[in-house]
Every structure is written in C-alpha cells, then in structure tokens.
Amino acid sequence: MQNLMAGKILLVTGGTQGLGLAIAEAAAREGATGIAIVGRSAEKAERAAAAIRDRAIGGGPEGAARAESGVEVLAIAADLAAPGEAERTVTETLERFGRVDSLVNAAGATSRGTLLDTTRELLDEHLAVNLVAPFMTMQAAVLDMRRRGAPGTILNIISMAMHGGQPYLAPYTASKAGLAGLTRNAAFAHRFDRVRINGLNIGWTATPGETVTQRTFHGADADWLARAEAAQPMGKLGQPDEIADAVVFLLSERSGVVTGSIIDWDQNVPGAYDQ
C-alpha cells in the first residue's frame, strides 16, 4: 500500500462488479476516505459496499490500521440509461461526502449488434450508458471541482473496440469511440482548472460479466476462459486487479501532469500485422 488515494473521495460507476468493483477495492486499499459505487441493483450495491469495507484492511500493520480508521462506502442504485440518473449519482455523492475528488466511469452496455441488425433501441441504450452517462457525470463532477477551486481527476474506461472492433460490436464501438473523443475534449477544456482526464482502452478482460457475455452471445462452455487465455500472447486475459492498479495510479498525484491520454491496455497492437 502506497496511500495513493489518501483522504480522497471517489465515485465509481459500474462499481458493484467486475472491473469497477476491483477499482473501488484498490482505491480503498490505497487510503481513500470515501467511495461511492453505482450499480443497477440496490441489493448488489450494498453487498459490494460491504465487500469493499472488508477487503480494505489488506494485510500487515498498515492494513490493520486502515481497518480501524475505516473507509466509508456509499451504495447507489441507478439506471444510467435513464435521464437524470447519472447526475443523481454525483449529487448523492456530494450530499454524503461534500465533494468529489476523483471519478471513474466504468459502467458499460455490451450487448451485440451489427450495423445492419442493430435496432434504434439497442443503439440508444449503448449511447445512453457508454457516452451520455459519462458526459453527465463528468459535467457534474467538474462543476463541483471548479466551484471549490480544487484539482481533480477523471478516468474513463473505454475499449480497444474504439479502434474499430468486431462487426458485431457496432453500437458498442460507436459509443466507446465517442467517449474517447469526449475524454480528450474535456481534458483540453479543463486543463487550466487542473482537472486531469484520461482514458484506458481495455482489451479482453477476465471478469464474471465477460463469462456471462460469452455464454449469452457466443454459446461458450465452462472451458472458454482456459482456451481463450491459451491463445493470447501473454497466456492470459487482462486481469481486473492489474487494470485497477493502473486506474488508481492515473487518478493519483503519482501520474503527474498526464491528461488527455488514451492508453491501450492490451496485449495486441492495433495496426500491426504478422505479414
């Protein structure tokens, strides 16, 4: 533990499972004072909040001290596809903690659809969750940071699919490419407010949600993960804990002046070919 988030207040959308939960847990271990996590299910959000509190203790004397001081975790149930819900998550965080130091947009819609078979409803869902919701949480968080005259950090979970993606990811790719553009636009607009905004293009990652996706859309069996990892250059898929450490670093002062960066977090290189 390096206390990279010491005393900070963090809001994580999609923070009740998978990568979002790993990010919240990493922030707790790194000394965050308050963490708000957002998910669609109130019950699941409360369970995740309890897990974050339990796991924040870590190991050794530092972990024991952290357990005694505690980390306050606010569970927020919200449907980010609905108008006004994204802004409400920031409002509730401000009501509980008084400020937002850092924001992570990790919630995402991942249903499949090609250019030809995607319905307007499916496209609207992807744009609402993957682009509009981050836009509105960023707006509300930056307004708070400017009001206080305080620096802040924002990290958007984007996707390697923003480079083009598979044909069946048309609405997902469109929404994530939009989020990448928004990330750079907002970073430039608010650099003199000392609000640093960056993004991670996440590649194929081993999460419970990915297992559901593989079974739902691709008919995967129980051995899908082992086969998938065996075919990867590094012999494994991306790991939530590893990505979470990178997110916490980018949110912290240790990442210095970096802003407007979209970092590919993957083991393949876009635009590079064997032959």
Tell me what each language-model feature is:
Residues T114-L115, L122-L127, A228:
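Substrate-binding pocket helix/loop in short-chain dehydrogenase/reductase
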Residues V104, R191, R196, V258-G260:
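Short, small/polar-rich loop/turn modules that mediate ligand/substrate recognition or access, typified
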Residues M138, S175, T183:
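Active-site helix of classical SDR
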Residues T16-Q17:
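Conserved glycine-rich cofactor-binding loop
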Residues S159:
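Residue(s) in the substrate-gating loop at a strand-loop-helix junction
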Residues L143, F188-F192, G256:
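Alpha-helical segment proximal to the catalytic Tyr-Lys
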Residues M1, G164, V248, T259-Q275:
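Short C-terminal tail/terminal secondary-structure segment
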